[in-house]
Amino acid sequence: MTVVHFLRHGEVFNPEKILYGRMPGFKLSARGLEMAERIAQWGSDRPIAQIYASPLERAQQTATPIAQKKNLPITTDVRLIEAANIFEGKTFEVGSGVLFRPQSWKYIWNPWRPSWGEPYSELVDRMTEIAKFAASNNVGKESLCVSHQLPIW
């Protein structure tokens, strides 16, 4: 049976609680590294033939332990990258976050039709593409795609 697993990267060290999106330099926390090790344990006895990961560091870090355990390369694929977002680098919370900045309201008035970044339809298209690609290149086997919350959601 052909199986494509989608996995969100582990917990990220983000003490300022900003929306980091595609920003560089956001690495896994100690807990996130532990999560990546647990995935490696889970996958050690699975017939995973290929590992794909977003180019962002946190996804690469999450994929590394299982790739090492399985002796597989990590294939970086931009289709797995986090959604583009104009709020990168800002806090998005109650209080001092984006929600209390009137200049931001034009972007968030309709959460079902985002105007703050990459349209959902484009996310669906690229994630569907990578799923089909992974399945067709690993027929009868399993593959693992390490991505981010919004693209998987």
What are these regions (language model features)?
Residues 36, 63, 101-102, 152:
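A general structural signal for well-ordered alpha-helical segments in protein cores
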Residues 68-129:
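Phosphate-handling substructures
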Residues 60, 128-153:
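Active-site-adjacent alpha-helix immediately C-terminal to a catalytic or transition-state-stabilizing loop
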Residues 9, 79, 148:
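Cofactor-binding loop segments of dinucleotide-utilizing enzymes, especially the Rossmann-like FAD-
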Residues 53-54, 125, 146-147:
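Short beta-strand scaffold positions
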Residues 2, 7-76:
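Active-site-proximal alpha-helix that buttresses catalytic centers in soluble enzyme cores
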Residues 37-44, 124, 128-136:
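Generic structural signal for well-ordered alpha-helical scaffold segments
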Residues 13, 58-60, 83-84, 151-153:
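Short, active-site-adjacent cap segments at secondary-structure transitions
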